[in-house]
From Swiss-Prot:
It comes from Salmonella schwarzengrund (strain CVM19633). It catalyses: a lipid A disaccharide + ATP = a lipid IVA + ADP + H(+). One of its GO terms (biological process) is lipid A biosynthetic process. One of its GO terms (cellular component) is plasma membrane. Transfers the gamma-phosphate of ATP to the 4'-position of a tetraacyldisaccharide 1-phosphate intermediate (termed DS-1-P) to form tetraacyldisaccharide 1,4'-bis-phosphate (lipid IVA). Belongs to the LpxK family. It holds the Pfam family LpxK. This is Tetraacyldisaccharide 4'-kinase. Keywords: ATP-binding, Kinase, Lipid A biosynthesis, Lipid biosynthesis, Lipid metabolism, Nucleotide-binding, Transferase. Pathway: Glycolipid biosynthesis; lipid IV(A) biosynthesis; lipid IV(A) from (3R)-3-hydroxytetradecanoyl-[acyl-carrier-protein] and UDP-N-acetyl-alpha-D-glucosamine: step 6/6. NCBIfam families: lpxK. The gene is lpxK.
Amino acid sequence: MIARIWSGESPLWRLLLPLSWLYGLVSGAIRLSYKLGFKRAWRAPVPVVVVGNLTAGGNGKTPVVIWLVEKLQQRGVRVGVVSRGYGGKAAAYPLLLTPETTTAKAGDEPVLIYQRTGAPVAVAPERAAAVKAILAAHNVQIIITDDGLQHYRLARDIEIVVIDGVRRFGNGWWLPAGPMRERASRLKTVDAAIVNGGVARAGEIPMQLTPGLAVNLRTGARCDVAQLSNIVAMAGIGHPPRFFATLEACGAHPQKCVPLADHQTLAPADVQALVGEGQTLVMTEKDAVKCRAFAEDNWWFLPVDARLSGEQPDKLLQHITSLVR
């Protein structure tokens, strides 16, 4: 229903316009207060790169963060990552991740980024506190913040927006009548716009999410996902249909697709109940970090990597590395 409202297919979005106007006024006033100097943002002693969205819902932001961290690491840059830690609840903040940190404490995306990149990761509702925790514990040269485009309390040097190339900006309205956190005109002020799927427009960087081999949660064994049979697909991400479409494109045809809420807590019994005798569970890598502790033999995940096209990605990386002292 929300997808139909935000796309404009359902006329119900008109009923929500008063709330959207209120959302837009408040969010605009917050941004203006920082722009005019009525409020002051905290500036880190190292460059800060924000990777965020203009819309609610999954746009492929976390794969972009992982891509950016890995590319900078390949250039010898010491990178730290901060996040709000959605879906997690720690006893105290900021929380600096360790190999033992669970998704229940840190959230699924920070744990995934930490496991994939090995970069220092810290979470806190106040992003500046997370940055300070990393700087106190690690000699990093640059900070990447996973989400937080609208978190103006943290000053930033580079802003990158990730856009779903198929859904774009829906009906163009602020939440809750539409998907927008900020209006599309905000694109004029960011340093780069990366478009996940669909067709990129002039000045935008095209990106595709490229699936790898399926990985068994218990053994680490790898195989072509099309070789798995009797698949039940599970996706607890911002836009589950994208994952299900990826499986179909890989030649894996799920018998059942189970969409879950983004950052949803997964209880062992609930996940186990999805899979019948002789069936194979295939999930996203983000779900896998929550399920690994209680995984069964026939549970697999399909990792995806961001692939950015054209000359612009190299120019963006050169621009970012030029800020590192």
